Amino acid sequence: MVENSTQKAPHAGNDDNSSTKPYSEAFFLGFNNPTPGLEAEHSSTSPAPENSETHNRKRNRILFVCQACRKSKTKCDREKPECGRCVKHGLKCVYDVSKQPAPRIPSKDAIISRLEKDMFYWKDKAMKLLTEREVNESGKRSASPINTNNASGDSPDTKKQHKMEPIYEQSGNGDINNGTRNDIEINLYRSHPTMIMSKVMKREVKPLSENYIIIQDCFLKILVTSVFLDTSKNTMIPALTANANITRAQPSVANNLLKLKEMLIRQCQTEDEKNRVNEFTDRILQNTNSNRNLKIGMLLSMLYNSVGYQYLEDHCPQGGEYSDLLRNLINECEAILPSYEIIERYKNHFYEYVYPSLPFIELEIFEESLSQTIFPDPNNPSKVQIRMGSTHLRAKVENLSLLLVILKLSYMSIRFLDHSTADSSFYLSKEIIDKYPIPNDFILLSQRCLASENWCACANENIISCLLYIWSFFAFSPEEGDFFLEHPTDVISSLIMMLSTSIGLHRDPSDFPQLISPSTSDKRTLNHRRILWLSIVTVCSFEASLKGRHSVSPISLMALFLNIKDPDSLTVYMNRVRGDLSDINNHKLLRIHKFTFKRAQLALLLSDLDNLTMTYYGSFHLHSIEFIREKIEIFVEENFPIVPLKSVAQDKSDLDDMNVISEMNILSSENSSSFHNRIMNKLLMLRTSMAVFLHFETLITKDKSIFPFYKKYFMVSCMDALSLINYFNKFFNGEYRHAISSLTSFNVTKFIQLALSSTIFSLLGIILRIGLAIHMLSSEVQKLSGTTDPRIKELNTKVEKFSTLQRDLESALEGIYCSASEHLRFTYFPVFKMLALFDVIVQRMRKGELWHGIFTMIQMEQMHSRIIKTLSITLGVKLDKKDRLLEELMACNHVANFSVEDIDELNRNIKKEIQISSGLKPPVNTIDLTNGEPFGNAVPTFTKTWSSSLDNLEKLSSAAAVGQSLDYNSGLRQGPLAGGGSKEQTPIAGMNNLNNSINATPIVDNSSGSQLPNGFDRGQANNTPFPGYFGGLDLFDYDFLFGNDFA
C-alpha cells in the first residue's frame, strides 16, 4: 500500500475493464488512479455536473456522488462514510446508490470492476485507520475528527527508507489547535507570482524552476544581496550585466578578471585545464571571438534558412550533375571529416557507450546508407570520399548530417574525462582524441544540411533523429548552460514535438497503412518511429518539469500512441516491437526499447508534479504531493536499480569475452541512466518540498495553526537536499565504479550539474534559518538570565542541539562544495560561475560570518536609488525598508519553536542519510601576497589542513576569496561601520558574543592572515563611483538579472 494515496469510490462504466495484474504497483496506483488534486484542472475526463434525475430521455446511469453534492452540482470526493464537503459544512451526507434505478442492460464487467475497486478502497481505508491507531498508541501524534474523515486515504509504505511523521502536535503552544490536521489545500502558482525583470527582458519564475528558491527565499535573497553590496561605500558592484561595454566603461573589471585568469592558470596542471580557464574567462567578458557567441549562433541557425530558396534534389539522371548546393555540401563534408578509420572509431564508440542512452537512430538503416556513401580516399589516407549516387540523395544527406552530430557527441562524451583514472575505451585513446578533435563546426554543418532540405516543411524520421541529437548536444555539452539562466534547450524540444506530431509520430505506426505495407515503407521504420516518440515524450516532459513551464500534455499525446494507464502497457508495447523486428534475436534492441519505455513512464509520472504546482484556479490538497512522491519513489526503486557490472559474468574468465564486455557496457549505460533518473526524481522532490515550505513560511505569521506543516516540510526539504548530496558524494567517491563505467557517465555528471544549484541553495537556506534560530534562542536565554525561569534549561538544550545540527549541515554543504570544485568547476561553465559566488559564501561560513554580513548590510545608510531599484525588480529585496528586514526574518522563522524531540529526530534522520565526519574540514586556502603586488609574480601558495585526495583544490581560490572573502573580516573590524554606527552598537557584536557563549563556530580573527593587495585597498576603491574588486562578483553575465542602465 502507498502512504497518503487516495482510493476514491468508483463509478460504473462500460469501459472500466482494466486488468487487475499490474506490472508495477506504483504504475497501477499512479495511472489507474488519478493523482488527487489534478482532476479539476488538468484532467479531460473529470465528471461534469449531473443533470436532474427526472430526465427520462437519457439512459439510466448510477451516480456515486452524495445527495448534497449532486443537488449543489459540486464535485464530490466520494469519501465514505461522509464526503469531505459535507464534513466541512456540517451537512448530512447520504449516498443513495442502492435507491437509483439500475441501467437497463447492466455490464457484468463494470459491476465486477466496481466491486473490486470498492474492496481496494475499504481495505485502504481500514489500513489508514489502523495506522493512525498504532501511532496514537505510540504517542507520536494525536487523532482528530479531521484525521478520521479526511479525504487523504493514507496507507503505510514499508519501502520508504526515510519516513518522517507528517504532522504531530506542537506542545506548549497555545496558538495551535488541539489535534492536528494532516491535510490542507494550497496554491503555489497563483499565490506566489514571481518575475525576474530588467530593462531588456522579463521572465516568469515557475515553482519547480531552478531560480524559484533564489527569488522566493527571503533568507537567501538577503544573503546574496549582502554579498553584492560593498560594505564601505554602500555601493553595488555594477558589472552584473550582459552589456559587454561595461569592460570598457569600467576597465578595472577586465583587469581584475585577467589577474584572476593569470592566477588560475598558474595552478593548472594540464593544457586542458588551461584551455578551460581561458574559455570561461573569455566567455564571462563576452569577447566577440569566444565560443559562447558561436554557440548562440549555432542555436539561432536552426531557426533560419541559410540557403535561400534552393533545396536539395532527391535524385539526378545517370551521368548528370548535382546541383551547386549539393556539391558544396559534399565538399564541406569531405573537408571537415577525418579519415575513414577515425570515423569508424568514433562511430563505434558512440554505438557502444552513448547510443543505449540516446537511441534516436535506426542503426541498420543508418549503416547501410553510410556504407553506400562514405569511402576511404585512395589519394589521401587522412580524408574520405563521398559518393552520393543518383537516387535517395536527400536520405543520404540526412544520414551524413546524423553522422556529423554523432561524431561530435561521441567526442563530447569522452573529451572531459580524467584519462588518468577513467576507464579506457576500446575504440578511442587520448592520443586519438587530441590528434583528431571534433569541433563545433560539425554541428553547424549538420544544421546547414537540414536547412538545405527545408526541414520545417519536409520533416521525416531522419530529420527528427538529427534534431534530437542536436538537442542532446546542447543539453549535455559542458560548455552549454549558465547559472541563473535557463538554457533554452526547450526551444529545440518544442520544435521537435511540433514536427513529430506533424508526421504522426504520436500514433502507433501500425495505424498507417502506408507504413505497414512492404512496398511503400521499410519495416524497420516502425520500431524506429516508436522509440522516437518515447524519446520525444521523455525529453519534453523532463524539460517542462525541470524548468517549471506549462507542460505539453504528453499524457494526452501518449493516449493516441498507447494506453499508458494500462498496467500491462509495457507488455503491450514490447509485443508490438517484437512483432515488427526484422531480427527476432536482437536482444540488445529489445532491451533498449524496454528501458526507454520505463524512462518515458517516469517522465510522465514526474510531469504530475509540474501539473500540480502549476495549478492556477482553485487549489490542491497537500496529500496529493505525498501521493505523487510515494508512487514515484516506488516506481524508481522497482525499475531503475543500480546493478553491479560483474553480475553478467559467471566467472573471471568471462570478463575477457567480447559478448560479455558488450553486455557489461549495456548494463553500464542502463545504470548511468538509472542513476540520473534517481537524481532527477530527488531534484524535483526537493524543489517541490522547498516550494511548499516557502509557501507555509509566508503564511505562518498570519496563521500559527499551520506550524506542523511548516515543520514537516522544513524537515523534508532538509532530507531531500542531503539525499541528493549523498548521491553526489557516492558518485564522486567512486562508490558506483562497480556499476557505472566512466565512459557512460557523461549524462550523470550533467544531471549532477543541473541539480547542484538547487541542492546547495536549499541547504544554505536551511543553515541560515538554524543560525537565526540559535541567535533568537540565545537572546531569549540572555533575557531570562538571572531568573529562575524553568525554560532556561530547555532553551540551552535547544541551542546546543541546533549548534550541533548546524555544524553537521555546514560540513555537508562544504563537502559537496569541495567535490563540485574538484570535479565540475572547470568542466561546466554554470558551476564555474556559481562557485565564484559560493567562494565568498563558504569563506564567510567557515568564519561563522553568514549573518555577520547580513547584519552589516542592514546597518548601511544612504544607499543609491539605482541599487534599491535594481535589487527590487530582480531579487525582490526591499532595501528601502531594510530597517525592518531583520524583524521580518525573525517573524517568519519558526525553527526556534521546534521541540527538543523534533531536533533530535532531525538529527537522527540526518545521521541515517549521510555520514558526516566531524573532523573533516576542507582546506583553507591562503595566498601569499607579501610582495605587495596584486596577485604578485610569485605563484600563490596553499596550505592544506586535512589529508585529502582533492589535489585540484589549489585551483579553487578565485579572486572572490582574494578580494571580498579574505579581507571581509579585517574590513569590518576597521573602526566604525558605514553610517556611523560602531561595531559594539550593532547586532553583529551580540551575535559574536552569542557564538562564543554557545560554543558555535567562532568568527576567526583574520589579523594574521593576508593583507589586501595593492590596487584593491578600500580607500583607493572608494575613489571610484563603483569600487568593486573581483571579490564583489563583478564578472557575472546574468543576461536578465541586471539591466544595462537603470535610471
From Swiss-Prot:
Keywords, in A-Z order: DNA-binding, Metal-binding, Nucleus, Phosphoprotein, Sporulation, Transcription, Transcription regulation, Zinc
Gene3D superfamilies listed in its UniProt record: Zn(2)-C6 fungal-type DNA-binding domain
Protein name: Oleate-activated transcription factor 1
GO term, biological process aspect, one: positive regulation of transcription by RNA polymerase II
Subcellular location: Nucleus
Organism: Saccharomyces cerevisiae (strain ATCC 204508 / S288c)
Region: Disordered, residue numbers: 1-56, 133-163
CDD domains xrefs: fungal_TF_MHR, GAL4
SMART domains: GAL4 (SM00066)
UniProt function note: The PIP2-OAF1 heterodimer acts as a transcriptional activator to induce the transcription of genes encoding proteins involved in fatty acid beta-oxidation, a response called oleic acid induction, when cells grow on fatty acids as sole carbon source. Recognizes and binds to the oleate response element (ORE) (or peroxisome box), two inverted CGG triplets spaced by 14 to 18 intervening nucleotides, in the promoter region of a number of genes (such as CTA1, FOX1 to FOX3, FAA2, PAS8, PAS10, etc.) for peroxisomal proteins.
Annotated GO CC locations: nucleus; Pip2-Oaf1 complex; transcription regulator complex
UniProt GO molecular function: DNA-binding transcription activator activity, RNA polymerase II-specific; DNA-binding transcription factor activity, RNA polymerase II-specific; sequence-specific DNA binding; zinc ion binding
Matches recorded under Pfam families: Zn_clus
Portion annotated as DNA-binding: 66-93
Motif residue range(s): 9aaTAD: 1034-1042
